[in-house]
Swiss-Prot record:
One of its GO terms (biological process) is methanogenesis. Signal peptide: none annotated. This is Methyl-coenzyme M reductase operon protein D. Keywords: Methanogenesis. MCR is composed of three subunits: alpha, beta, and gamma. The function of proteins C and D is not known. The gene is mcrD. Pfam families: MCR_D (PF02505). InterPro entries: Me_CoM_Rdtase_D. It comes from the Archaea.
Length: 159
């Protein structure tokens, strides 16, 4: 397994994020994509305008491989888990096509692969010991799982 980070030099619009995710998930070796960026809350969480709705133009529903995903952040980077390095050049081609303003692709270790103390505190020992290891590190411990994770099924060959 290889992990790469794709770091565009600008925050992405929802349409660009959708194009990138659909292109990335169309590759055979891509197992998981994690997005990072600035939060796009539904309402102001603090200050004098607390509770006021935030009508951000980029908080949209996007379609990734047929699954509707509510975009709750303005994406600034992607962590991608690949089976092997055979399609690294294809990811670079996708980036060149979509990110004309520049980007950086790094190979390294970005996704945690073992449970932390926070996982045990949040979910409990029995849950952590039985969870699919691919789900580790996917969600913020302060958030609700269903609000922060969207599962995109990988289509099999021949479909």
């Amino acid at each position: 397994m290889i992990e790469i980070e794709v770091f565009p030099h600008r925050f992405l619009k929802a349409t660009t994020t959708e194009k990138f995710l659909n292109s990335a998930y169309s590759l055979e070796t891509v197992q998981r994509v994690i997005m990072h960026g600035e939060s796009l809350p539904q309402k102001v969480n603090y200050g004098p305008a607390k509770g006021t709705p935030v009508n951000h133009s980029e908080r949209k529903l996007i379609n990734v491989q047929g699954v509707e995903v509510q975009l709750t952040l303005q994406v600034g980077r992607f962590w991608i888990l690949l089976d092997d390095e055979t399609e690294l050049s294809k990811i670079d081609e996708i980036c060149k096509e979509l990110f004309q303003y520049g980007y950086k692709v790094s190979e390294g270790r970005f996704i945690k692969d073992s449970p932390t103390v926070t996982d045990y505190m949040k979910y409990g020992e029995s849950f952590v010991n039985n969870i699919d290891k691919r789900m580790l590190g996917v969600t913020d411990p302060r958030s609700r799982f269903e609000n922060s994770v969207s599962l995109i099924p990988k289509s099999e060959k021949g479909e």
